[in-house]
Amino acid sequence: PEADKNALARRVALDLTGLPPTPEETEAFISDSTSGAYQRYVQLQLNKPAFGEHWARMWLDLARYADSAGYADDPLRTIWGFRDYVISSFNENKPFDQFTIEQIAGDLLPNPTTEQLVATAFHRNTKTNSEGGTSDEEFRNEAVVDRVNTTMSVWMGTTMACAQCHTHKYDPITQEEYFKVFAIFN
């Protein structure tokens, strides 16, 4: 059976913003019997800042965003600009190809804007360690491995971790291909 307008209002708001609609929004939608009421209600939800915040959260999980370094001393990082870039990109309905280019190579665009430079913080969303006794070269290498694996899983929908050690006859990516991608991010 078709959902009633009250349930529909709730489902749309929760799906698009992660938040329930206000009582006023629900009442306005229920009482609007004109053509296009549903489309207007959807647009109302899409125009809320909560839309970008809700959908950016899922992208930020994929991008391994965190406000901390991820280790025992766990100092705060100043990476919130990347979070805000992702939220505004969703709220502005930025085309996905542009969103992708800016995160992978925004700094390589001709005359990059501050926003495009901030977008490349996608590559900085990796664990950082400032503890004494760590090997800078080893840690740099681990960060490159993390960038390769994350970039491939986010944009290609496949993991490359196995190819880091060996070529497997059932995996689509060989060890040689893994290290070619590694060389790009190194």
Segment roles from a protein language model:
Residues P1-N186:
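Short, structured secondary-structure elements
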